[in-house]
Amino acid sequence: MDHRLLEIVACPVCNGKFYYNKERQELICKSDALAYPLCDGIPVLLESEARAIKLDETNS
């Protein structure tokens, strides 16, 4: 995952910042508690593809 991409992309729901979870290959939006998957290194920024996460998962 190119960390420069994190400076450009924003959460499609709240326009907030993402945090990269390398272990799960996901972009995490702490504001909405949503995790967006990466497919071959490309973020899938569709709300319908995001999974809800628990608050303790946002610390990853």
UniProtKB/Swiss-Prot annotation:
Residue ranges of coiled coil: none
SUPFAM superfamilies for this protein: Trm112p-like
InterPro entries: Trm112-like
Disulfide topology: none
Gene3D superfamilies listed in its UniProt record: 2.20.25.10
HAMAP family per record: UPF0434
Superkingdom, natural source: Bacteria
Cellular component annotations (GO), alphabetically ordered: cytosol
Protein known as: UPF0434 protein SG0997
Family statement: Belongs to the UPF0434 family.
